[in-house]
């Protein structure tokens, strides 16, 4: 089951990366795992470093992918992003600022939505 979840997660990250590339984003890293958490995608556009949370659901029968990104999830992504920046000062100093985005995907309806600069 764990391996299947990883495979599904990778599929979602790949779909999100493709969408963002088409929108002019540069992909710096994918599936960056640390002891503080995982950053699905790290991308850049207009000198902004962006940490992207990706949520993929096969259907919306039991809720939307957006419902999976609440206050606690955003706080975890923010903390992981801050630790990433502390541990990568050369990367951190290259950019004007950073933000958190999300890409939500529903396979059944082929819906893929990019939410920019999330706050909580």
Task: Walk through the language-model features, giving the residues of each.
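Acidic-basic catalytic patches of nuclease active cores, encompassing PD-(D/E)XK
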Residues: 1-30
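Mid-chain, well-packed structural core segment of small domains
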Residues: 62-92
């Amino acid at each position: 089951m764990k391996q299947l979840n990883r495979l599904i997660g990778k599929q979602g990250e790949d779909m999100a990366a493709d969408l963002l590339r088409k929108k002019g984003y540069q992909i710096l890293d994918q599936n960056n795992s640390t002891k503080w958490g995982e950053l699905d995608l790290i991308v850049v556009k207009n000198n902004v470093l962006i940490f992207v949370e990706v949520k993929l659901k096969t259907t919306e029968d039991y809720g939307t992918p957006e419902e999976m990104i609440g206050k606690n999830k955003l706080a975890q992504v923010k903390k992981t992003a801050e630790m990433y920046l502390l541990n990568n000062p050369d990367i951190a100093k290259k950019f004007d600022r950073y933000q958190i985005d999300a890409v939500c995907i529903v396979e059944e309806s082929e819906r893929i939505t990019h939410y920019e600069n999330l706050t909580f």
